Amino acid sequence: MRVQMFSGKETGEFIGGKTSLQTEAYENGLKDEELYYNIKDDLGLISRGNVYLDKTAQTIFSELSIAIDKGNLEPLKNFLKNNKLQHKKADINAKNGYGDTPLCYAAEKNNFEVAKILIKYGADLTIHNAKGETPIELFSQYGNREAVNYLQHCLDILGNNSLYEDTI
């Protein structure tokens, strides 16, 4: 099921680097904070599982990126939990228009709490962004030792840590 707005555009469509939801809000003169507060109720519907989004990269990423940008973990947790419980196939490793997965995006924002949630729900730690950087490399650039150690531990468990020997 795809969610459509009044304009007929689908929420996951990308137009000029923004989702159609963001584009429509900006066309109507809304700023970032206003956009967030105007759609937070919609995010609540999505996170409660009343609205099911299709699995396009743009849709999953746009919903996750709002939670990442605002640091509000509850909509993100609820979205991922309901996606898993409802056996939906939204791709947690989908890339946005800039080549970032949600985990890479969280690492670029140095948001370790969001990264832990994404990893819990199956985010792949080995996927590179468009610049060829992995989440562990991105956290390392910020000097976020706690995040780097956590990701290394996860990679050790998965048996993939040899990919990251020279990142710190």
Curated annotation (Swiss-Prot):
Disulfide links within the chain: none
SUPFAM superfamilies per record: Ankyrin repeat
Statement: the UniProt record of this protein carries the keyword Repeat: yes
A Pfam family it matches: Ank_2
ANK repeat coordinates: 59-88, 98-127, 131-160
PROSITE patterns: ANK_REP_REGION, ANK_REPEAT
Keywords on record: ANK repeat, Repeat
Highest taxon in the source lineage: Bacteria
Protein name stated in the entry: Putative ankyrin repeat protein RBE_1411
Organism in which the protein naturally occurs: Rickettsia bellii (strain RML369-C)
